[in-house]
Design a protein with these regions (language model features):
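Hydrolase active-site cap/lid region
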Residues: 207-255, 311
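C-terminal catalytic histidine-bearing segment of alpha/beta-hydrolase fold enzymes
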Residues: 298-351
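Short alpha-helix in the alpha/beta-hydrolase fold that links the catalytic acid
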Residues: 117-119, 279, 292-302
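Short beta-strand element of the alpha/beta-hydrolase
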Residues: 88-89, 99-108
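Short beta-strand/loop motif that positions the catalytic acidic residue
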Residues: 276-277, 282-285
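Cap/lid segment of the alpha/beta-hydrolase catalytic domain
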Residues: 111-173
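Gly/Ser-rich "nucleophile elbow"/oxyanion-hole loop immediately N-terminal to the catalytic nucleophile
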Residues: 157-199
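N-terminal cap/lid segment of alpha/beta-hydrolase-fold proteins
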Residues: 50-96
């Protein structure tokens, strides 16, 4: 009996250790002193102007009980890295009549499609016919890390980095164009449009929220502010780029920081303090993030007025396990509940 009890205790301890990725802190605090929110009157340069563009929808290629599933595409406003300069994705369009809310799920460009696929299909299933979902594909990277970390000349590096800044600008403007199209569709409730961003697309979503007043809410998972700090301190692929530039071209860390500050300051959330409604934002980050510095994550939280913030006790990539059964789907459930709340689905939502 005693031996069996000890084995059960050991099993329980091991189970707890194996679910470390779901250990997290949650903050629900008042806005910082002096914080004042005013809805953004419009977009600022270089995100302020664009031409309306049609979004082309395919015939449905699949369906669920509540949604038709079709592909969509439209031409990018700039150079977005796609071979044909297109924005592509899937549209889970509700079969029910009447105006429904819209959730746009952003990609992790050039890397894993699991997080956006999981949230897109999962929330469409959860919301039923009360919500449309659009999943943006991310096959073309905003930052071509392999090329950036191996380009042989300083001139070539500067050109690639400037092209990446243009891809970022295009991503923000293209999502503004998508929102513009969505507000004119008879099946979409223009007052209930939310975005979900992960890592790099969390940065884009943060810029978008400050420049597109028709986006009513956003999820920022593994994002931050102070973009030049991210480039200066992120490890992973971005760290390989930094090491290459400092070693090959003889740049100092300060020169590297200032170069990316000049490129990305127009998009940085620090520029848009007061344009974020903390009641309409969910921030998810990782305490031991090895890409987004703690100071940059704290800055985003301050600038956005102390929105609901969930901090997982993990590093950058491993925090995404919280979207999976390995992480007990903790962040997935938190995202769903947040969307239910801001889109007015509380009464009808399950877990």
């Amino acid at each position: 009996m005693f031996a069996r009890a000890v084995l059960k205790l050991l099993a329980a301890v091991l189970a707890l250790e194996c679910t470390g990725c779901v250990l997290h802190l949650q903050r629900d605090l008042e806005p910082p002193p002096g914080f004042h929110y005013e809805p953004p009157p419009g977009a600022t340069q270089p995100f302020d102007s664009f031409e309306r563009t049609p979004v082309e929808l395919s015939q449905p290629f699949d369906e669920t009980r509540n949604h038709e599933i079709m592909r969509f595409e439209f031409r990018s406003s700039g150079r977005n890295g796609h071979p044909d300069n297109l924005v592509e994705g899937q549209y889970f369009r509700s079969k029910a009549p009447g105006k429904k809310s819209l959730v746009v799920v952003m990609p992790i460009w050039g890397t894993s499609s699991y997080p956006p696929a999981k949230i897109s299909t999962g929330y469409a299933r959860r919301a039923g016919d009360d919500t449309h979902v659009m999943w943006i594909y991310g096959n073309a990277p905003v930052f071509p890390w392999t090329e950036l970390s191996s380009v042989p000349t300083e001139e070539g590096f500067r050109a690639l980095a400037q092209d990446s800044a243009e891809r970022y600008r295009s991503a923000v403007v293209d999502m503004r164009r998508l929102v513009d199209w969505a507000t004119m569709q008879p099946e979409i409730d223009a007052s209930r449009i939310a975005f979900v961003g992960f890592s790099m697309s969390a940065l884009v979503t943060a810029t978008l929220l400050a420049n597109e007043p028709r986006v009513s809410a956003g999820v920022l998972m593994m994002g931050a502010a102070r973009f030049s700090e991210i480039f200066s301190r992120c490890r992973n692929r971005a760290g390989e780029v930094r090491e290459h530039v400092l070693r090959t071209f003889g740049w100092t860390p300060s020169e590297y920081h200032d170069f990316f500050e000049s490129l990305f300051a127009p998009a940085d959330p620090v520029r848009f303090e007061g344009r974020y409604d903390p009641n309409r934002i969910l921030m998810i980050d990782a305490m031991f993030d090895d890409c987004m510095p703690e100071s940059a994550r704290a800055a985003l939280w301050e600038i956005t007025g102390h929105p609901q913030r969930v901090t997982f006790l993990y590093q950058h990539r491993s925090a995404f396990y919280s979207l999976t059964p390995l992480g007990l789907n903790v962040s997935r459930r938190k995202i769903y509940r947040f969307l239910d709340k801001v889109l007015g689905r509380d009464a009808a939502a399950g877990d």
